[in-house]
Regions:
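Short linear motifs at protein or domain termini
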Residues: 1-100, 211-230
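Conserved amphipathic alpha-helical segments that form helical-bundle/coiled-coil interaction surfaces
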Residues: 100-164, 175-185, 193-203, 207
């Protein structure tokens, strides 16, 4: 029987914990990352912390800066534009594929997630989690493993953006209607319309994100592992 390496399991736990802290802003962009302080705070040895930090660095969530050391990565204005531009392309493709390949059960799941959004109006934390679930369900409904991998990589980068764009006034009703349009097109097996609806959704999300960054608004959404709203 193969024995489990305690440091390996602790490293996995530390990785998940630190990623959650980056997502909810506990470790915000630009924050110093000190291995010994994290080990002490999490009450574990430095070995699993080192393993977790290596993984986060490989994902681009931690970077090394001269004269500063390791810090949580920051996305500048151009990086945000590039991130959303790529998401528009990939999510549009995911919606197109979903219209072709999604099962009836997967379409029903998407529809139920959209319905649940309406039941949680005003609860930014719940809405952000539902939004995350909706997009993940959309990615998987496309049934393309390579597209899924690319989208999950972008999803990791999204957690560096901080709070939800639902902090932008009137964003939720628009985003909700956009989700409905995506699901409707997928249910009707209309790849062209599904892609167009998804692309429009991401373009509008990009505008909301840039507005959020310009205004320095702060979301009520805290203490959640869900990445920023799309």
């Amino acid at each position: 029987m193969k024995k489990t390496d305690p440091d390996s399991s602790r490293g996995e736990w530390a990785y998940g914990r630190l990623k959650m802290e980056i997502a909810n802003g506990t470790m915000g962009p630009g924050s110093r990352v000190r291995e010994n302080e994290i080990a002490e705070r999490l009450s574990i040895s430095r070995t699993p912390v080192r393993e977790a930090l290596r993984r986060l660095e490989a994902e681009g969530l931690i970077v090394h800066v001269p004269h500063q050391g390791a810090i949580i990565a920051e996305l500048d204005h151009q990086a945000v534009i590039e991130l959303y531009d790529m998401r528009e392309t990939l999510e549009g493709t995911a919606a197109r594929y979903a219209a072709r390949h999604a099962s009836e059960a997967e379409i029903q799941d998407l529809a139920e997630l959209v319905e649940s959004e309406q039941e949680n109006v005003g609860d930014f934390r719940a809405l952000a989690q539902l939004n995350r679930a909706f997009h993940m369900a959309l990615y998987r409904a496309g049934h393309n493993r390579y597209l899924l991998k690319a989208l999950l990589s972008l999803s990791d980068a999204m957690i560096l953006l901080g709070g939800t764009t639902l902090a932008v006034p009137d964003r939720f009703p628009v985003a909700h209607a956009e989700h409905q349009a995506i699901v409707k097109a997928i249910a009707e097996r209309d790849p062209d319309q599904a892609e167009a609806a998804a692309r429009s959704h991401i373009r509008n999300a990009q505008r909301a994100r840039l507005k959020l960054l310009r205004a320095h608004l702060v979301s009520d959404f805290t203490e959640s592992a869900a990445p920023a709203e799309y």
